[in-house]
A protein has these predicted regions:
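Short intrinsically disordered, low-complexity coil segments enriched in acidic
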Residues: 2-3, 26, 34, 135, ...
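Extended, charge-enriched "interface" segments that sit outside catalytic cores
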Residues: 36-160, 167-171
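Exposed alpha-helical structural elements
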Residues: 9-12, 25, 57, 68, ...
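Aromatic-lined, polymer-binding surfaces characteristic
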Residues: 147-151, 156-159, 165-318
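Residue-level signal for secondary-structure boundary elements
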Residues: 25, 37-45, 106, 262, ...
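Generic detection of long, well-ordered alpha-helical segments
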Residues: 7, 16-19, 23, 59, ...
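Short, hydrophobic/amphipathic alpha-helical patches that form generic packing surfaces
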Residues: 24-35, 71-75, 179-183, 286
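Boundary detector for helix-to-coil junctions that initiate low-complexity/charged tails
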Residues: 1-33
Length: 318
């Protein structure tokens, strides 16, 4: 069976008009024509490092003086378990439910957490791989390829070398395992798991300056990471290991996550949105609901709710 000849420009244009309509086609053409200009302007904006949030920036985000930042951070810590359905008082009941309804699952969860404490990960078909004492968040540990951690996220390449999978560092940096560590810390009472969760969050923030490196190249993963961090913080909120200094650092990074997402939403030139855009919105919704004290939060929440309602009409066809 012979391959079909590629469509010429006129045929492609006609096909596009038939599929999305004349007005949408015109809008897409304008967006494509303006793309180089928009890209240059966005790059210039990004290089001014607008997303990084230092302590003074965090105080401004909370609308408090630097002297009052400690109290603002403490208010967030106390509020998180109420904003997400986490109740330390129900631990005994949860353990009983595990034993009755899912025998062996709690033990398996602890075993998984122990492997994570040993920096052993099994991602995307890799099989168990020990990553060593210090986790390299920028490396595809399946192929050994490492992305430049200082590179602007706009310049991060993928699909450029055979056998290299950018999704490996992305999957690791989503932080799903941090929630498991926090969960295990809560259910067992053992400080080992909370300590490891806190150490990995610290290491990630230090190794991944906002907007630099492979782990900022996909906004969807930024959003997923923010959600997982918020859950981990809510579960660990009662831990004495969660110090004000540490929580301040994490909250500053979460504010940076929110600002990054608002500035890098995943919408195609033709206006088509996908699961990536939905993930961006859910990340903003979580940040808006969980960090209500932050001045940006109401805008994040309002935008996310409005767009999620619109996307349900666009993306859910059943």
């Amino acid at each position: 069976m012979g391959s079909e000849a590629p469509l010429d420009f006129a045929a492609r244009l006609l096909s596009k008009v038939q599929h999305i309509g004349l007005l949408a086609t015109v809008r897409m053409g304008i967006r494509k024509a303006l793309r180089p200009l928009r890209s240059r302007r966005h790059r210039a904006h990004v290089l001014r490092q607008p997303y990084r949030v230092a302590r003074l920036d965090l105080a401004a985000a909370f609308g408090v003086t630097p002297e009052d930042l400690t109290a603002a951070v403490e208010r967030v810590r106390l509020a998180l378990p109420q904003r997400l359905p986490v109740s330390p008082e129900s631990v005994a009941e949860i353990r009983a439910l595990y034993k009755k309804q899912a025998p062996g699952v709690l033990e398996a969860t602890v075993e998984s957490a122990d492997r994570i404490c040993g920096h052993v990960f099994d991602l995307l078909g890799s099989g168990p791989v020990a990553l060593g004492t210090t986790i390299d968040w920028h490396r595809d540990f399946k192929s050994g390829y490492r992305w430049n951690p200082d590179q602007c996220f706009l310049d991060v390449a993928h699909g450029h070398e055979v056998g290299v999978d950018i999704k490996v560092p992305w999957e690791l940096s989503r932080g799903h395992h941090l929630v498991l560590l926090a969960q295990t810390a809560l259910l067992t009472g053992a400080p080992t798991y909370a300590r490891e969760c806190i150490a990995q969050l610290t290491g990630w923030i230090e190794a991944n300056p906002t907007g630099c490196g492979v782990n900022w190249a996909c906004p969807m993963d930024v959003a997923i990471r923010a959600v997982n961090w918020l859950w981990a913080l809510a579960v660990l909120a009662g831990s004495p290991l969660m110090t004000e200094v540490w929580l301040t650092e994490v909250l500053a990074s979460l504010v940076a996550h929110g600002r990054f997402l608002m500035d890098n939403l995943e919408v195609r030139d033709d206006g088509v949105t996908t699961n990536h855009y939905l993930a961006d919105l859910v990340g903003l919704l979580y940040l808006g609901l969980c960090l209500k004290e932050v001045r940006d939060a109401e805008g994040w929440k309002a935008f996310a709710v409005r767009e999620l309602v619109r996307e349900m009409d666009r993306q859910v066809l059943a």
